[in-house]
Swiss-Prot record:
Biological role stated in the UniProt entry: Functions in mitochondrial division. Functions in peroxisomal division. Mediates membrane fission, perhaps mainly of the mitochondrial outer membrane. Mitochondrial fission may be promoted by recruitment to mitochondrial membranes via the egl-1/ced-9 complex. Involved in the coordination of mitochondrial division with autophagy in response to acute heat stress during larval development.
Keyword presence, Mitochondrion: yes
Region (G5 motif): 247-250
Source species, domain of life: Eukaryota
Family: Belongs to the TRAFAC class dynamin-like GTPase superfamily. Dynamin/Fzo/YdjA family.
Origin species: Caenorhabditis elegans
GED domain ranges (all copies): 620-711
Protein's name in the database: Dynamin-1-like protein drp-1
Resulting phenotype, S41N: Interaction with caspase ced-9 is no longer enhanced by GTP
Length: 712
């Protein structure tokens, strides 16, 4: 299992070359978290056995420091010999950003960390998420992989932003949220452990404490008469992986250049004297061994998931590269292939034979079918055959068709006049159907499959041109399609076929029978009234020969004659003139009326409101029924013929001629360079994906080198 940590270190090197957070795999590592001046740097230096970290007041660590500790035995010449043949006899360090440069002076390591930090964050106290990667090779260290983060602070200093506390907190959470990480929460012993900020942050992402280890620093600086026994034993706040106490070098020790080896010896003496029962489970040596063991077991547990993650990312990169396509070499062949693929995908979308069927919405041919049989059908059904046609309109049309002669039957001309006006109303929804199909065929350009969409992104200028060609072809076909649809309505208007089988047999015969039946009933009624009137007049005639005594000297015969005269005048007023009102009913004519020609009133343009006679009601009912039934026949014809016209002149024509039109307009040698020019973003994405894929392949090789016997 000792080989597991070097494996992770190699993986960190591989993925560090990518430099992009989204491409990183969450590797097992130890994340060091603590407040400012909590002693984090001292703990790390004690683990390494060297002074190499920047020191000072305020925030010293301003970028994440990925620290890889590699144990190299003094007699391991294979690892200590450099490529130039020199043999390294002591500890050395290497930075990722300096390449193969070797640092044997650890003061120079400190200076390089400071310079690299200032290069990115500035000379004041700004922070950055961009990590610094440092490898240290020594016979004194155990193999570890750690991340040192900026200390938690409350008040901004220098050119730090006012939200510096929030920025540092977000950075810490970003690293400790990695489920493959171990959290090393550093807290000074001379502060209340119950209010430890690192422990609080760790609880947010690791509530069960499965991957949190606490370190209690500055045990030698506690107040006289107090100790950290209860804290170290977990009685104050229990920490599942344990709480380990350490003693750091004081600032005076550092100024006096006290060696870390001597400081570790003094730490052991302090532990034996102050905490004899806990000495074996505290101190820097125990912390290093404990971290090494925890990290190895953690890597062992994470390795299967790590293998799976690398495989998944590798497959995704391969898929992305296929989508991005190979760099264009033969532009003639590439252009023809793209045109052919697009035309095939467009045709498949119309016919419903595409491999990737849309499941969230109707598109292509299915949407055209929906327009024909649902949208267009409902639109025609919503047209009322008698809408905007009143009884007065019908009656006026009947009378205008008869001219000066009263009609015995309903004139056919009035029916044709009225039904044509209603048929004309079918033209608007028919043209709207053409428009909807045209819009859908334009929209289908965006629904031609994943491959086509990727090529749209890769060659935006080419697909702008393809869109223009498709729009042009559709626009060309729109005019003849509209003309044919208008002609279909005009054909129905040109000839009203009253001999249509559905119209003649079902309607005219029935209406004729009803009209004859009504005439027969009215005739018998008139005969009965006439016979009764004759008998009354005969009896009255015999009686009027005799003088009739009056009342108060009034002759009743004279009164009857006067009433008869008034009755005749009233009947005259209900004749032809009565149709225009009762202006002629009065027996006296005013001087103004005598000034008009023939002493007749002005004829109004429309009839005044009155109750229709039974004959008029019958005529109106006949016309309404004829219009309704014939309109339904025409509506069926239009509902059937308009979709056929659209399919013939628009849909099928575009489907059959699109590819040849694309080749004719786009296959031009002088324009190929412009059409097949990739966006810079697409080229960069291909390069990034190739780099990621190369790193993943290296990672896969590294992981495959770990034998199962080593892991378990």
């Amino acid at each position: 299992m000792e080989n597991l940590i070097p494996v992770v270190n190699k993986l960190q090197d591989v993925f560090a070359t990518l430099g992009r957070k989204e491409d990183q795999i969450q590797l097992p590592q130890i994340v060091v978290v603590g407040s400012q001046s909590a002693g984090k740097s001292s703990v790390l230096e004690n683990l390494v056995g060297r002074d190499f970290l920047p020191r000072g007041t305020g925030i010293v660590t301003r970028r994440p420091l990925i620290l890889q500790l590699n144990h190299v035995a003094l007699d391991d010449e294979s690892k200590r010999r450099r490529s130039n043949g020199t043999l390294l006899t002591d500890d050395w360090a290497m930075f990722e950003h300096t390449g193969s440069k070797v640092f044997t002076d650890f003061d120079a390591v400190r200076k390089e960390i400071e310079d690299e930090t200032d290069r990115v964050t500035g000379v004041n106290k700004g922070i950055s998420l961009l990590p610094i990667s440092l490898k240290i090779y020594s016979h004194r260290v155990v193999s570890l992989s750690l991340v040192d983060l900026p200390g938690i602070t409350k008040i901004p200093v220098g050119d730090q932003p006012v939200n510096i506390e929030e920025q540092i907190r977000e950075m810490i959470l970003l690293y400790i949220s990695n489920p493959s990480s171990i959290i090393l929460a550093v807290t000074p012993a001379n502060q209340d452990f119950a209010t430890s900020e690192p422990i609080k942050l760790a609880r947010e992402v690791d509530a069960g404490g499965q991957r949190t280890l606490a370190v209690l620093t500055k045990l030698d600086l506690m107040d006289q008469g107090t100790d950290a026994m209860d804290v170290l034993m977990g009685k104050v706040i229990p920490v599942k992986l344990g709480i380990i106490g350490v003693v750091n070098r004081s600032q005076q020790n550092i100024l006096d250049n006290k060696l870390i080896v001597d400081a570790v010896k003094d730490e052991q003496s302090f532990m034996q004297k102050k905490y004899p029962t806990l000495a074996s489970r505290n101190g820097t040596p125990y912390l290093a061994k404990r971290l090494n063991m925890l990290l190895m077991h953690h890597i062992r547990n994470c390795l299967p998931a790590l293998k799976a993650r690398v495989s998944i990312m590798n497959a995704q990169c391969q898929s992305d590269l296929v989508a991005f396509g190979e760099p264009v070499e033969d532009k003639n062949r590439t252009l023809l292939q793209i045109i052919t693929r697009f035309a095939t995908a467009y045709t498949s979308t119309i016919e419903g034979t595409a491999r990737n069927i849309e499941t969230t919405e109707l598109c292509g041919g299915a949407r055209i079918c929906y327009i024909f049989h649902d949208t267009f059908g409902r639109s025609l059904e919503s047209v009322n055959p008698l809408e905007n046609l009143t009884q007065l309109d019908i009656l006026t049309a009947i009378r205008n068709a008869t001219g000066p002669r009263p009609a015995l039957f309903v004139p056919e001309v009035s029916f044709e006049l009225l039904v044509k006006r209603q048929i004309q109303r079918l033209e608007e929804p028919s043209l709207r159907c053409v428009e909807l199909v045209h819009e859908e065929m334009q929209r289908m350009v965006q629904h031609c499959g994943f491959t086509t969409q990727q090529e749209m992104i890769r060659f935006p200028r080419l697909y702008d041109k393809i869109n223009e060609v498709v729009s042009g072809v559709l626009k060309e076909r729109l005019k003849p399609t509209n003309e044919l649809v208008e002609n279909l309505v005009a054909i129905e208007l040109a000839y009203i076929n009253t001999k249509h089988p559905e119209f003649t047999e079902a309607n005219l015969v029935t209406l004729l029978k009803e009209e004859l039946l009504l005439d027969d009933r009215h005739g018998r009624s008139r005969n009965r009234h006439a016979s009764t009137g004759e008998r009354a007049v005969s009896a009255h005639g015999e009686q009027q020969l005799q003088p009739v005594p009056g009342v108060n000297g009034v002759d009743l015969n004279a009164v009857l004659q006067q009433q008869q005269q008034q009755s005749q005048n009233q009947r005259a007023s209900n004749g032809f003139l009565g149709l225009f009102g009762n202006a002629a009913a009065s027996s006296k004519t005013s001087p103004q009326e005598k000034q008009s020609a023939n002493f007749l009133p002005e004829v109004p343009e429309t009839q005044l409101g009155r109750k229709l006679t039974s004959r008029e009601q019958r005529d109106v009912a006949i016309i309404e029924r004829l219009i309704r039934n014939y309109f339904i026949i025409v509506r069926k014809n239009i509902q059937d013929s308009v979709p056929k016209a659209i399919m013939a002149l628009l849909v099928n024509f575009v489907r059959d001629n699109l590819q040849s039109e694309l080749v004719r307009q786009l296959y031009k040698p002088d324009e190929m360079d412009d059409l097949l020019a990739e966006t810079e973003d697409m080229a960069q994405r291909r390069r990034d994906t190739l780099e990621t894929m190369k790193a993943l392949q290296q990672a896969s090789v590294i992981i495959s080198e770990v034998r199962e016997t080593q892991v378990w």
